[in-house]
């Protein structure tokens, strides 16, 4: 069963923002549909790779970034590292079919980790959990 209400995010005067990052357009569309269905109040943007995601992060503040791990251009690791260094207040969710290749440091730095394919309930639970974890953390910068 899906929770009916998402946790409160850092966005108090605007709709929570989610950035979806995946080089597979069908995955982006599927994630987008899940969020539209279960979290219609979220503003959802997408990036097709690490470089585009990092650029998007410089343009807007996001509450959650859900990124694939394996992508060209540094992949999800590059996105995760940019979030850790420059946007520690942003919830970080990793989504991949190759989680076995995720090193302990990156696994620890993610607020939630999802194996592909994930169910709608797992996706929403991961995003909600990541938002709650960030809300309970003191703001910090690594590095």
Each language-model region and where it sits:
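Two-component/phosphorelay signaling modules centered on CheY-like receiver
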Residues: 25-45
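Receiver (REC) domain active-site loop signature in two-component systems and cognate sites
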Residues: 71
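C-terminal output helix
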Residues: 118-130, 135
């Amino acid at each position: 069963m899906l929770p009916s209400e998402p946790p409160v995010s850092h966005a108090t005067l605007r709709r929570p923002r989610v950035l979806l990052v995946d080089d597979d357009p069908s995955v982006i569309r599927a994630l987008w549909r899940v969020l539209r269905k279960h979290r219609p109040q979220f503003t959802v943007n997408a990036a097709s790779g690490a470089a585009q995601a990092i650029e998007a992060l410089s343009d807007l503040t996001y509450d959650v970034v859900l990124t694939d791990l394996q992508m060209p251009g540094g992949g999800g690791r590059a996105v995760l590292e940019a979030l850790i260094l420059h946007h520690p207040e942003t919830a970080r969710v990793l989504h991949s079919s190759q989680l076995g290749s995720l090193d302990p440091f990156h696994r620890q730095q993610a607020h939630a980790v999802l194996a592909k394919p994930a169910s709608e309930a797992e996706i929403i639970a991961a995003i909600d959990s990541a938002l709650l974890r960030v809300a309970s953390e003191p703001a910090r910068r690594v590095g």
